[in-house]
Amino acid sequence: MKFSLIFFSNSYPEEAGGAYAVISEMARYGDRHGFEAVWIPERHFHTMGGIYPNPAVIAAYLASITTNIRLRAGSTVVPLHHPASIVESWSVVDNLSHGRVDLALASGWNVNDFVLAPSAYPNLRELWFERIEEIRALWRGQPVNYPNGAGKATPIVTYPRPLQAEPNLWLTATKQPESFRRAGELGMNVLTMLAGISLEQLAQKTARYREGRRSAGLDPDTGTVTLMLHTFVHEEIETVHRSVRGPFLDYIKTSLMSHLQGGAVDVGRQLSAQEIDQMAEYSFERYFSTAALFGTVAETRKFALAAREAGVGEIACLLDYGPSVADIRANLPFLAELKHSFETVEA
């Protein structure tokens, strides 16, 4: 089992050094302690994650302060951007990082994000898969035809050329089993989360992924399913509860409001504050026991082993969902111990 670090939400504006101090510190820590990668999201127009409008820009900075850790778009919303723009930006990062770039490619879901590309929203899934193939071709240096300003089809080759001949690609997939199969058929990895499902249900989706790889003539046992999990590991379970309960409840409420405003959830009416509180409490209890990496090293190891049985090959540890920076720092040595326990057994 591999372990990486992923960021998604909180800007920690109170930190000295500004909004990006936390991700910078955690990326350095991950680099020193052998974590696989740091994932940088793309988020727009909301306090939750709004400091990450362009993951390539942040990755370019992280390239200058790290040496070994992979730098991953987690995720780039493909229908919002021209494929050539995606490849140009990340090729710069690939050069700056000496070939450490990987890309997770998402379809997008928040209708408000598509003020950046309103014509793309009605057929975003079709554009998603169409542009994935264009991104691959452009990365390889193959010309792709696009209409120029006069409407004439023009073959384009992007520069600078990336250092890696082939991009390592993840398909961001959560709810649709068919997306897992499609990722397998395309020879991509998968970035996913437990969005209202159990590990047992995730296992059914990872099986679809393996079926997709097999049907495409690929080794079904290769390819990585990466699972994002809210993470807090500590030697004392009481410290885990104290550190995550309040921040995680606030995180759930903010996330719920983002989904309501973005059109991903439609309940047909405006929810009351009491209803939102009740939903947050229910979600917290479910997440804590069945859908997060919360607990001692021994407890989280059991969960990670269960995830591996469900077909997961990497856990992306979400850190910035609300715990204080001091608490996040306090959890890191235990998270590193958890990671090391798998390296020792698997070596």
Range-by-range predicted roles:
Residues 7-20, 76-84, 164-175, 231-234, ...:
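Active-site mouth loops of central-metabolism enzymes
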Residues 122-158, 200-312, 340, 346:
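An alpha-helical appendage that flanks or caps ligand/catalytic pockets
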Residues 17-29, 89, 173-181, 297-306:
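Short, acidic/polar
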Residues 82-188, 200-203, 207, 214-216:
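Internal, glycine-rich beta/alpha segment that forms the wall or movable "lid"
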Residues 1-65, 69-70, 166-167, 342, ...:
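N-terminal beta1-alpha1-beta2 module of alpha/beta enzyme domains
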Residues 1-3, 35-37, 66-71, 96-102, ...:
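Short, well-ordered coil/turn segments that N-cap beta-strands
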Residues 30, 34, 42, 62, ...:
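Conserved, mostly hydrophobic/aromatic
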Residues 37-58, 62, 77, 109, ...:
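Glycine-rich, proline-tolerant flexible connector loops at the mouths of alpha/beta enzymes
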